Amino acid sequence: MKNLLLTFLVVTIVCLDLGYTLICNRVHGLQTCEPAHKFCFSKTVMPFPNHPLTLMGCTYSCPTERNAVCCSTDKCN
């Protein structure tokens, strides 16, 4: 009986994420954020005329630019 309970405990620990980490979209794939990063962001910049560049990922605080999107749930950007 003790072995069964121990097995369930191990499976629970392995299957559950003990510390919540935010997951944000990137241009190519997903990014698991560090614990200090609380927001996902997306913003478009124009480094050259007619060549927009989209930046996406995790951040400590929300960008203040008017073309930036900031959110705090998984894959929201």
Curated annotation (Swiss-Prot):
Disulfide bonds join 24-40, 33-58, 62-70, 71-76. Expressed by the venom gland. InterPro entries: Snake_3FTx (IPR003571), Snake_toxin-like_sf (IPR045860), Toxin_cobra-type (IPR054131). The keyword Membrane does not apply. The record marks 44 as: Key residue for inhibition of muscle alpha-1-beta-1-delta-epsilon (CHRNA1-CHRNB1-CHRND-CHRNE) nAChR. GO terms for molecular function: acetylcholine receptor inhibitor activity; ion channel regulator activity; toxin activity. Keywords: Acetylcholine receptor inhibiting toxin, Disulfide bond, Ion channel impairing toxin, Neurotoxin, Postsynaptic neurotoxin, Secreted, Signal, Toxin. The record marks 48 as: Key residue for inhibition of muscle alpha-1-beta-1-delta-epsilon (CHRNA1-CHRNB1-CHRND-CHRNE) and important residue for inhibition of neuronal alpha-3-beta-2/CHRNA3-CHRNB2 nAChR. It is found in: Secreted. The keyword Zinc does not apply. Residues 1-21 form the signal peptide. GO terms for cellular component: extracellular region. Transmembrane segments: none annotated. The record marks 28, 43, 51, 66 as: Important residue for inhibition of muscle alpha-1-beta-1-delta-epsilon (CHRNA1-CHRNB1-CHRND-CHRNE) and neuronal alpha-3-beta-2/CHRNA3-CHRNB2 nAChR. The record marks 46 as: Key residue for inhibition of muscle alpha-1-beta-1-delta-epsilon (CHRNA1-CHRNB1-CHRND-CHRNE) and important for inhibition of neuronal alpha-3-beta-2/CHRNA3-CHRNB2 nAChR. Belongs to the three-finger toxin family. Short-chain subfamily. This three-finger toxin binds and inhibits the nicotinic acetylcholine receptor (nAChR). This is Short neurotoxin OH-32. It comes from Ophiophagus hannah (King cobra).
